[in-house]
Swiss-Prot record:
Keyword Transit peptide: yes
UniProt KW Transit peptide keyword: yes
Gene3D superfamilies according to UniProt: Phosphorylase Kinase, domain 1
Protein name: Altered inheritance of mitochondria protein 9, mitochondrial
SUPFAM superfamilies: Protein kinase-like (PK-like) (SSF56112)
Source taxonomy: Eukaryota, Fungi, Dikarya, Ascomycota, Saccharomycotina
GO CC terms in record: mitochondrion
Amino acid sequence: MLRRIVNTGTKRLFRVPPRSSALCFSRRLSDQTKEVYTKINDTKDPARNQFFQYTWGSWMKNDKLERARRQTRFSIEGLSKFAKDFKPQDAALGKPEHLTNGTVALKNNWTKEILGETGHDVKSIASIHEGKHHRIYKVTLANDRQLVLRIPYRLESDYAIENKINSEVATLDFLALKLKLNVPRVLAYGPTRTNILQTPFILMEYIEGDLLMKQWNPLVPDSETSEEELKKVIDPIMEFQDKLLSVTFNRFGSLYFFDDVSAANQKVVPYDEEDNLLKDRWRIGPSTESVFSKNKKQLASQKISQFNGPWDSVEKMLKDLAEVQVESLRFRLGLAQADSSNQVEDVDQLKKQIQTFENFKIISDKLLNPSSPAIKNVEELFKPRLFVPDLDPLNVIVEQKSSKPFFIDFEHTVIKPFILASYPAFVAYQGTKLYNLEEEIPGFKDMDDVEKQQYEFMYYKTRNERLWEFALNNKRHDLIAVASPHIKLLKAPYLQVVNCKTDKDFMFIENAIIQLQAMWEAYVANQICNSTTPEFPIEYTAEYLDEHQSDLENYQLEVASTPFAATGGWVPQDMFDVLKEQNILVEDENGNYKIEADAALKNPPKDP
């Protein structure tokens, strides 16, 4: 018989009375935790369905589709059966073991410290986080040891998800074994659905503790202690990055285990390794950077594999980056022109996007000179190094028992030149820089509080980025040239490409290219860019530039005036429910939602 217990307040797991055929699972609903008991063998139990559904938000458009793409159904029976087979052993290093149940086991991590000696039956499963790319479940064993089960959303192709999981697990393995960094140990994984859990997954060590983000206050006013407070978050992340940068690789791409890359890629060693146990453990394969998979589900894996590396040169890497975007857009354009697309397409906009990426292809290998005498330590800046795109205090857990920072989430980690790496998002700032409010802003003292806050925001963001650059200079003075405004300007088109999120974001790419025109001749003269001719590589007509400027301004106005545009139309569920209850959010005949302006003015939304 099914029992439900609802608790309001602190999220927690519930213990299960001893029984051989029942399993407890719980899920977080806002500030509530629901606990449900189900029979392990009852795969059709309707009480399970909601356990797999996405609940942390809703979308203004295509809500049902977006939720369906984030459903994380897996075999509870399969997980339970797999856990029973855990046999703790010593930490002797062996190759990843492909098991008959379709999973891959890293048995060197099956230690008593992580698993305990006995009692490996699954006691409970709790949904503890629904992120942007995957969902996190906490699995509690009968001996009260806890594990993390991470399941990706179906936002990308099966090919992309398989590569992503294979690479992330190998990267975690490399960070733990080679660099001795604090990361969760992976016990097992399945890169495809053909395994006992019937879904791609990673099963890893659970780290108990608080997020480092709890200590991050980016808008803390300047004081005697403010810099020290900010550095408590910046410094451990810089320490981690410093260790990432300590290994230079032999090519560009992403890390994989030896057996997960092609025979051709197996022949190329990733870096110079002296430890015989590690020499043939990893190889460099196709890049898992998100730009090679985002919005490319329609492209066949054979087509994408022509462009996603690995590469022996930066120039080829940049050309392929442009090519994969053009190929994807041309495919979409062909479907739209043949009335075969499964979505409404703006044909004119697709053509503009293609033109922008063609422009990027022309200029990509001319942006930065790999042998520039004007760029300090340019050879070091162009060497292949690990880059983690989600280095963030949100992805750092301060372990409860040791107070050591443990780093999590290495999706889309790649090997590329440090000169092309972006700053971590929590410190990066692309706006107008302010270094001294009273000296740079006339009349600042006499402004009202609202106006002051706008300038203070710009100042604090500038300050935080500078603190990151100071930390980089202290750790890797040989790489500090990336802080140059000229380097930032020259690599801006590349960064706009890899960070492109929506179809209209191509305008930011074009704008970054256009902004180089004014300085191009000087960059050529000083040998900073990789060109010997002072003429700008792309010919823009006045008509093209005027149209681009108009389109960009309209897009920026659209983003500024459209509710939830910054989150892609995603609304936190508590807020969504409140707005809907107050008739501020209204559903139309197509199942999409819009803001009812009159209702919003009459009934301002309350805090959820």
